[in-house]
Design a protein with these regions (language model features):
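Hydrophobic alpha-helical membrane segments
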Residues: 1-202
């Protein structure tokens, strides 16, 4: 499936669900996007807030990311009615999501320390792990990571190009001081979910 088809599907799938998608992705960003929150902390010149934001992202990032993936899968597959509360549905496997988040975070961080390209490659390799766990909570951390790596063989460049295709939209986000991200972020996330299902079924 081409990038254009993935995006077209996302727009169609979001029809009727924009409100709940915007709210869910916005809360996700507030809770785990430490970069955005750190910018706020710098504005108030309070370094301790920045540290707190990073800790929140570390300890909540895994469980919220897995919940978001489950929510996004509900939108795309129409298996269940997408609900905001799904974002918080994965606390029953909190320790597993925490371990997964820490391993991914440290692996990507080490990759970026060594050089930017290894960091990008590692992030692409592990990009499907949360989706895998969201679909099957019984899978171990190692299974989620290894299946993501295997799934992304031959598709890392495709995902990289897919992300690049949203540059125009992110420029609009910047020009609107972030307001447009309310609509752009759900659009991107649902498109990424379509990408996951597309390569999973091959």
């Amino acid at each position: 499936m081409s990038t254009g088809e993935l995006k077209a599907n996302a727009r169609e799938q979001l029809r009727g669900y924009w409100a709940v998608a915007v709210g869910t992705v916005l809360v996700t960003t507030i809770l785990i996007d430490s970069g955005a929150l750190y910018t706020v902390s710098e504005y108030f010149d309070m370094a301790e807030i920045g540290i707190s934001c990073n800790l929140i992202a570390l300890f909540l990032g895994g469980v919220i990311s897995t919940g978001l993936c489950k929510f996004l899968l509900d939108i795309v597959t129409k298996g269940q009615e997408p609900k905001f509360k799904t974002l918080f549905s994965q606390f029953n496997i909190y320790l597993k999501t925490l371990g997964l988040n820490i391993i991914i975070y440290l692996s990507i961080a080490i990759g970026y320390i060594l050089f930017i390209i290894p960091g990008i490659i590692i992030s692409l390799m592990f990009s499907q792990a949360y989706y895998i766990l969201a679909e099957d909570n019984s899978k171990s951390i190692n299974q989620c990571l290894s299946e993501s790596v295997e799934m992304m063989k031959g598709y890392k460049w495709d995902l990289f190009c897919l992300e690049l295709s949203f540059i125009g939209w992110w420029i609009i986000v910047a020009l609107t001081f972030g307001i447009a991200s309310l609509w752009v972020s759900p659009y991107v996330k649902v498109t990424e979910t379509n990408f996951y299902l597309n390569i999973k079924n091959k």
